Amino acid sequence: MAYQSEAELELQFIDQLYKQGYDTISIPDYDALVENFKVQFEAFNASKLDKPLTDKEWERILNLMLGKSVFQSAKILRDKFVLEREDGSKVYLSFFDSDHTKNIFQVTHQTTVVGKYVNRYDVTILVNGLPLIQVELKRRGIDIREAVNQVMRYKKHSYNGLYHFIQIFIISNGVDTKYFANSDREMLHSLAFFWTDFDNVRLTNLKDFSIAFLARDHIIKMLTRYMILNDTDKLLMVMRPYQVYAVEALVRQATLTNRNAYVWHTTGAGKTLTSFK
């Protein structure tokens, strides 16, 4: 295969997401990220807001969101909250919807964030303005474990503020692609998973992975149905593909046939987690 630089892979990936219905947007820095979030948040909640948020109301929302752990941010993301407006009225607001058609999907790249060091993030997927999926790419031939190491460096030095709302990381060198859940803990490469189709065929190529995993309806299902907030360990978890397909099969069995079903698999496969979902 011909040589492909990381920059070429990145642009090819963004073009693929554009074809899948994502809007492309330039977000050069963190301030621009916050500004875009405000615009998209108001647009997403337009049916509940009869007028734009005031500066004080927006500050109140940011105070609710910022300074929290990854786990706390994941809980906030999935909860509705009551905003008391300056005129005394109250309104219930939310950050995203389980119906993918009601959300705003954007993709940006090369956002520069200043922490202990100056870092430039590869590709960020935004849902209603919030950075929920972060993609780190390496050129073909580079072990994707290098991307995990890069994520860890970013988490240590600059993944703060709204970036605590990242739910899923995706790493790829174009040929091999994996995903894993964000965490307040050190990330382990063993918890990064390949995605597969229903017949358990791995979709390792970044384009094939994007078409399946990052389809707008599917990624919303992953975020709303197939992630677990482990309150005991304060841990965010994402399900493996066979667990997702097992849950979907169990739900179909229960809803369409009104009959019972069971999970059968090997030790350590995640039967308890699948049954829980």
Task: Label the predicted regions.
Residues 2-277:
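ATP-dependent helicase/translocase motor core
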